[in-house]
């Protein structure tokens, strides 16, 4: 159906183009609906909607993803095989025939200029015969191919355009730098160009929102020429300048939004938590290990923030196993000592229980009360191993009365169910700690921050906003930290505890798999345990319809398949368990508990193991389909082993023969810290690797611009200049509207 939609669209436009151009001399506004543009019918309005385009402005901001350079116009006798060019000639003949042995139709045309003739062939595009009428002057653009036997040159599926009369000056698809757009079924780049070209000539360009001094200082092109040249550039250089302007604009708006949030946060009230230095010294002295210098520095930065009268907003970043949790826990104990409460939210029940157990074990004499609240239950721990299992309502009442100072939990801390069960309300919540903050939405975090000072009929200006500390093991490249989290302060733990041994990491070839299995068997015989990570849960359902090569490229072994293989064929005498996100919480808890107690030898799992799981006796990380993961994620997987006294190993398996993939995996084996891998990931895979699977709402252009450190720094500098001068943006009303609108759509998670 694709060519049917396209053909009807093109035929309609071809026959009505002059009318469309004449009609559109009446000025269109940027916010005019597409339905107001004559020549675009309901069917194509719907196609544009599928691309998120509803207005003229949204269409003009639907930027090309790349360009085809057909600007080299040559004689037919001058063309060379494989080299992109445009030829102009007269159609001498056109025919349609069914291809031999193939279920398709061929349209063939012969075009002639004063230097020679050339044949053009289109496959399954029979509508083209209506355009390629004998005697018409046309442009053909593409890279010519040579016939196998005769060596004669011809065009295969070239771009074409009728250029008789005045049309030659308005070429859109040939003889120029041609834009290629994001498309949808039934709406091609050719169709999009047909619509954009006349609109560009008739639209009223809005007022420039970037201040003149910023435009001048950063050498930015104006809005009107930028719109024209990003769609129909005279050169690739023109296109790059226009793209730079729009990329800068998106980053500039983002930074204004984030810096505005930062300025607003400073005006909020928070509980001042005076840190008892003697208590802190006593707590750290009682730890079974010494804090690293990085941990001490991070703890000092956090303590300093908490002692202020406005809310802390800090990200604590460090490699897996670097000791972030103990730093956050010490901050929570210090808050409790001042009579305040701390909420500690984790993304999974497994991790929440782990944090709860760590707090109990590390601070056994803490008598302020440590509660665990998850979807499957609740309990409270007081000093000297006095632990009470209670129903959630009882635990909630204790928290609301202030009888529990540290509350660890999952989404259950903020849950509001159909039964009427609400999340927890705290009496004096002063500190919120969120582990792996990018796994929670902005609204979820806001709900937790709102669990504090809610009573007494206080206005928002009178309320006390909790200090906010987020933790992440995801290494964040400097470019992203500048661009996406300029509203946060950063603390980085750059050292690993001295008792951590280096992990021997190897990229394993398929022929070495039996030896790797034997190695695992030997390690388990010595009392150790192993993780096996697979990217997918379910196997493909239509394997029989795929070739071996397609299976080889597309199917990563599922957890269930791997579990069956390992438990029945490879390690039949060992205890193998399986863990994935579709299991019930109670089942996952039992599996992890058994693995932690060494009742299970091998745990086959999905990427859930990436987040926080701590089993010191596990010494082998076995990653299937390693090429399917980002470098930083592989580094985090590796950090799940090497936490005990025994030497640990990480095996990276890939069935791919690609040298590039092998090179990427070897970089993980050689890496000494996650940050250098994160920088590589940003260049190779883009910012989506760090922002997670959930859409941020950020424009594609801004996402791509995040790979340009220099442009990010320029935009941040410009935003700071404007915010410092006019914090409320009152002098720039249109810019202020744009920033507010941007904030409604974009969320950094």
Q: Positions of the model-derived regions?
A:
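Conserved helix-turn-beta segment of the N-terminal RecA-like "Helicase ATP-binding" lobe
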Residues: 352-386
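Conserved motor-coupling elements within RecA-like helicase/translocase cores
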Residues: 378-407, 424-426, 585-601
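C-terminal helicase module of SF1/SF2 nucleic-acid helicases/translocases
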Residues: 512-528, 554, 558-749
